[in-house]
Amino acid sequence: MEYKQTLNMNKSGFPMRGGLPMREPDMLKHWQELDLYNELLKKNEGKPLFALHDGPPFSNGALHMGHALNKCIKDFMVRSAAMRGYYTPYIPGWDNHGMPIESAIIKQNKLNHKAMPIPEFRSACHDFAQHYIDVQMEGFKRLGVVADWEHPYKTMAPSFEAEEVKVFGAMYKKGYIYKGLKPVYWCYHDETALAEAEIEYQDDPCTTVYVKFPLHDDQGKLTGEEKKNLSFVIWTTTIWTLPGNLAIALNPVESYVIVRNNQNGEQYLVAEALMEKVMKVGGVEDYTVVSRHEGAFFENMLADHPFLPKTSRLVLADYVTMDSGTGCVHTAPGFGADDYQTCRRYGMDMVVPVNDQGRHTDYAGKYAGMLVEESNPVILKDMQEAGSLFASEQIVHSYPHCWRCKKPIIFRATPQWFCSVDSFKDDACAACDDVRWLPAWGIDRMKAMIRERADWCISRQRRWGLPIPVFYCKDCGKPICTDETIAKISKLFGEFGSNIWFEKEADELVPEGFTCPHCGGKHFEKETDTLDGWFDSGSTHFASMQKDQGFWPATVYLEGLDQYRGWFQSSLLTAVGALGKGAPFKECVTHGWTVDGEGKAMHKSLGNGVDPADVFKKYGADICRLWAGSADYHVDVRCSDAIFKQLSQNYLKFRNTAKYCLDNLTDFDPNHLTAPADMEALDRWAITKLNELLVRCEAAYKDYEFLTVSHAVNDFCVVTLSSLYLDIIKDRLYCDGKDSASRRSAQSALWMILDAMTKVFAPILAFTCDEIWLQMPHRAEDDPRNVVLNQMTKPYADYALSEAEMTAWETAFRLRSDVNGVLETARADKRIGKSLEAHVALFAKDEDTKAALEAVKAIDLPEIFIVSNVSTDEAAPAEGAVVEAGVSYPGLTVAVSEAKGTKCPRCWMHSETPDEHGLCPRCAAVCKALNVVFE
């Protein structure tokens, strides 16, 4: 007799292998036909708002793993919020203006951009940006991100530009925006100012110099002995800035010494705290301290410049420290913010002896026309020959580089537009207190950056950007930005785009009949600079979120760690400055960088990069999503083929668990779940463990801890289900009667587990969970079209076992662990084959073990151990039994011998009361109900 056909060995249409690269595109098509994003909004319309505002990626290249990590996390946030009952609008955005696109278009098309009409050049930039919006959008769609792809916001869109102009106007009206000559980061390779967020620091080798500035005028304060052969010794790492020196700064309260070099009679002024170090660097071994004075004593003395015909003034500054150098600080107002402020305080004129191209001007004398880096060795040689070089050293220091061209930059004073952050720093810091920061240290980082930052340079000497909406009166020369001009420019930009600024003359752009508010003049010029790209992206909360989406503030901002000084900060500053509100986000979350498998930065030159498109083709987008969902994204996230291979193995465990459930639910109707009172205790144990999973995952989703969700689901699949529950219930599912209460109990639990597990993992494993959902039987209240259109399962409180009952079950599983160890020994000794061939006898040697055996009396131990018989009351182990002590219970003795009775040919369990066909009573009853004909 072939009994296989009498077993409940059903098969679903769910394949064991995912075949994700082939299957996912079909699912994307299904989602598109379903219009999943809008269906999701309809489903939760009128419910509490969860608004993730998309930090715009720059539209200048294909997708990289940083993009993938960022968009995966955002999609996890949106999907999980939707499935927890929130209304979740999600508008993707792109940042379009800026130097990287200009540079790329010039290089790609070999353009002479300076000879091109500006509107024509800007149109080429626009097309370039739009191309990469399309490229990136397709990549994000392939990743499975649910968003309003039909209506993204773009900072180059006329509607956006029209609103950004209003942000500028509001800040100008409040007096927060001004034009001034101040030192800013300057890339002379690209000939533009840079913001702090556009700076990258790299370790560069350099020559540091200690330079002697001979005393010129002591203001009658020094004795004859003190001023004899006296020089003020400064230290600098930027030799090329020395032509711009106007002053030497001392700390007013620190002690300074005049030191005589007994070898050559020269005298030097240095800080006493640094004297020994300076003398050692200069090779001066025999020296004498002539006198001591506080720094304030030397104020307004004059020193001769070491190689130019001019003097340098001794000034005081609190920022002069005793950490390094000489205590006498080289001060060039055209090349440093502190230098600028100090010289301004002393009424000195601004001197900027370097032009836009990074070349010295005529002010630098013989060095005129030289690039700054070319002048370094020439100046060094001249100082050596003139005897003004005290010492020099070779060091490696951290130096700022342009984020785009990767070349060193300079600090240089130029006429620029600034946002006076000082005016509202306190308000910006106070706004941080109302934000939930993840990680929690984010608030301290943001506040420190705001407090320490200088005024924000918002102008750029570029063409591809939003024009600064300021006019100049030709009669009085004053800048003009009024409510009337802002309204007119906003209207024009909204209708025609910002190219109109470059296509029309100023007189055509101002309001009709407009006159200068300062002098009544009627003729105007336009500002030629464009706005910093960070002003663009910093305006998205107003230009896109508030205007187009109708909400403010956002629930959450999520971006990389670098955005504390980038988008997070620019958004905060424009919100506080322009709108007079708090932060534009209630929560601020950061993620780390993506790095290679060894933790190194990924670079094309190193060949260690990972292309998301390759991951999609080889493994599927769900594996990429699982990578993002399995990582502690607050720190750097490693990425390599080996990691994806391992994740694929973890993925198969989840998929195989789902397949097991689906295969055993093909004949099950979840509208008729077994009632709690009728459900088998083991099944209720599994549901109680499921409840624990659901509670843990709900808390994790609230805190955006997706790693916790992934690990919890994986542990539940591997430990709770595969290793225990699913293995134990196979007999009931396959061998009990199809409609028996015991089998329906197991199926009910299986359905509850699969339903809840699929929903709880759906935000992360979007494609696979939806594939499972489409295969599952559903209740009447479920939406069968897509798993994300359903709410996450709440814990099944009515099915939960009591704490005492759960303790008893945990005891049973600890006993099972000890029994399994002895079964393995018996199998290795060939005493038994399958575990169903075993009879297990348990013996307690101490009170704890006796109590454990007493606690599990009500539990069906043969079912739990997957053996034919279990006894706890035998006097001694059977002769020939394999006997071992327990591990979980050292007072336990486990004896394994051959099972008593006859092996049932249908279920393979041994029975002492078989029927005439050798069937155990259970199988005999099932076969009878099936009207099995025995030949």
Residue spans for each PLM region:
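Cys/His-coordinated zinc-binding microdomains
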Residues: E191, Q461, G477, G520, ...
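Acidic, turn-prone loop/beta-hairpin segments
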Residues: D95, V184, Y188, L194-E200, ...
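N-terminal catalytic cores of NTP/NDP-binding nucleotidyl/phosphoryl-transfer enzymes
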Residues: K42-S103, I234-T241, V315-T342, Y346, ...
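Short cysteine-rich clusters marking metal-coordination/redox-active sites
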Residues: C187, C402, C473, C516-C519, ...
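Secondary-structure capping and boundary motifs in well-ordered enzyme cores
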Residues: N44, P48-G55, G66-L69, I73, ...
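Alpha-helical recognition segments enriched in aromatics with Gly/Pro capping
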Residues: L215, Y346-G358, R462-W464, I486-D636
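Residue patterns forming the tRNA-binding/recognition surfaces of aminoacyl-tRNA synthetases
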Residues: E2-L20, D26, H30-L34, I106-P243, ...
